[in-house]
């Protein structure tokens, strides 16, 4: 896929003077930024059965788009959902541009725990593949555009890399936003100082309870006491994410 230059490519982003640094630019929009300029998005939820007989939930924005208008599919970030501020902002953008818009939730992120003894991870390109193929086959008249935020961008780019030129048969374009392409460096950074106290704590407060509910679903799946004691994402991934998805450890 050859990227096509757009006006946006030629415009350099400049943060407001009163919003310096990455932390301020991350936290302020999440808590206080205006999420949409038009009406708040209305979602229609679909439940899709996965190839391994589990399920994911897909939220489609109810928009008045042309039947042949492109479909913009957003893959959310770690512990994100269609309620995330960026998903709402993208839905607002799609409405303004006349696009169709959908947010497929990674497993366990739609508000209901999935059934299978697995969750999701940043290299889950097989999951991306069947989701995109289903969108493409369900709406063959619509060009398909995919964007991934953070972890979702990692998984989407992994899929694009695995597919190579054959990705053209499924999507018109892909984009990743704020994705930690160097996972080792990103993991090290989020486990230190301010990042550890704010972001790591926020993620673990969401991920640990879901993991323990998964353990209740599947007794013996992992060491629950060790997971309760995990203090950073590296330890959590070693105990939960890596073994559940066939990896030796976080480094693998």
Tell what function each PLM region has.
Residues 252:
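C-terminal subdomain of alpha/beta-hydrolase-fold enzymes, centered on the catalytic histidine
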Residues 93, 107-145:
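Catalytic nucleophile-loop/oxyanion-hole region of alpha/beta-hydrolase
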Residues 86-103:
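Short amphipathic alpha-helix adjacent to the substrate-entry channel of hydrolases
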Residues 69-77:
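Short beta-strand element of the alpha/beta-hydrolase
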Residues 78-85, 95, 110-113:
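Short substrate-entry loop that stabilizes the transition state in hydrolases
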Residues 3-5, 137, 141-245:
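Alpha/beta-hydrolase-fold enzymes
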Residues 22-64:
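N-terminal cap/lid segment of alpha/beta-hydrolase-fold proteins
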